[in-house]
From Swiss-Prot:
Keyword presence, Oxidoreductase: yes
Subunit structure and binding partners: Homotetramer.
Species this protein is from: Pelodiscus sinensis japonicus (Chinese soft-shelled turtle)
Residues binding substrate, per UniProt: 106, 138, 169, 248
Pfam families for the chain: Ldh_1_C (PF02866), Ldh_1_N (PF00056)
NCBIfam families xrefs: L-LDH-NAD, PRK00066.1
EC number: 1.1.1.27
Protein's recorded name: L-lactate dehydrogenase A chain
GO cellular component: cytoplasm
């Protein structure tokens, strides 16, 4: 008899059932692993699968996480180059793609990443036809559109991490300026993740007190306190971090785990994430932009109708036109 047989008496033969709350992360670069560790620390899954094309790196990352199992509450961590390891996932997070180079605009990355998605998405769909897709790779709004087109999924099941991070950065910087924790500082960045994002100044508040009502010049050129700079810092922050350390990882990893928590626990929290906005705010093309969305187990169920100033709406439409200009040129 083996030690196991001497130690344990089996009382019930378990049917081999698959995981119920499985999450897959595609791409084990800095962003993918930051997403993985953030998700593991929040105990969101009963199985975590990692996929990448670089097999040594992939196995190394898996082993490194498995060796920390004692300190985690996720019983199964698996990995593979073959997408069969992703089978029965509830949520699939796509972080794979060509990395943004210093000074390179997010939009420049597009076609390089479309070609990668043409391989990834059909494989994900094959093994998890009922999953939700969360796209993180940049340029995220265009690649969310690409994932939606290739997958054939309904639009509520394909989301982009979008402005969830931009809004978090905004709230952090707002908190630094006011000496208040970012949880108590409210403000929304919508539109394109990145260079043409739109700050909704009318909604910026602390404890329901509108900063714009207190100080009408907020966010305008006449603003002596330079609040407009806060938004500029949000836009520049990724470029600054890339310049300093070569890539961004921790903040986006935490932001993605925040979205994963809302989905896996069906919290129905409102997040500024990338969704199909055709028919909203005068947008007439098939583009994905960030607007406040009610998110849960089924994906996006509702969109909050924000009251925007005409110039804010104009900026959104301009973003949509820019994105559509690029999307219509893409080779699928």
């Amino acid at each position: 008899m083996s030690v196991k047989e001497l130690l344990i008496q089996n009382v019930h033969k378990e049917e081999h059932s698959h995981a119920h709350n499985k999450i897959t992360v595609v791409g084990v670069g800095a962003v993918g692993m930051a997403c993985a560790i953030s998700i593991l620390m929040k105990d969101l899954a009963d199985e975590l699968a990692l996929v990448d094309v670089i097999e040594d790196k992939l196995r190394g990352e898996m082993l490194d996480l498995q060796h920390g199992s004692l300190f985690l509450r996720t019983p199964k961590i698996v990995s593979g180059k073959d997408y069969s390891v992703t089978a029965h996932s509830k949520l699939v997070i796509i972080t794979a793609g060509a990395r943004q180079q210093e000074g390179e605009s997010r939009l420049n990355l597009v076609q390089r990443n479309v070609n990668i998605f043409k391989f990834i998405i059909p494989n994900v769909v094959k093994y998890s036809p009922d999953c939700m897709l969360l796209v993180v790779s940049n340029p995220v709004d265009i690649l969310t559109y690409v994932a939606w087109k290739i997958s054939g999924f309904p639009k509520h099941r394909v989301i982009g991490s979008g402005c969830n991070l931009d809004s978090a950065r905004f709230r952090y910087l707002m908190g630094e300026k006011l000496g208040i924790h970012s949880l108590s500082c409210h403000g929304w960045i919508i539109g394109e993740h990145g260079d043409s994002s739109v700050p909704v100044w009318s909604g910026v508040n602390v404890a329901g007190v509108s900063l714009k009502a207190l100080y009408p010049d907020l966010g305008t050129d006449a603003d002596k306190e330079h609040w407009k700079e806060v938004h500029k810092q949000v836009v520049d922050s990724a470029y600054e971090v890339i310049k300093l350390k070569g890539y961004t990882s921790w903040a986006i990893g935490l932001s993605v785990a925040d979205l994963a928590e809302t989905v896996m626990k069906n919290l129905r929290r409102v997040h500024p994430i990338s969704t199909m906005v055709k028919g909203m705010y005068g947008v007439s093309s098939d583009v994905f932009l960030s607007v406040p969305c009610v998110l849960g187990y089924a994906g996006i169920t509702d969109v909050v109708k924000m009251t925007l100033k005409s110039e804010e709406e104009e900026k959104l439409r301009k973003s949509a036109d820019t994105l559509w200009g690029i999307q219509k040129e893409l080779q699928f």
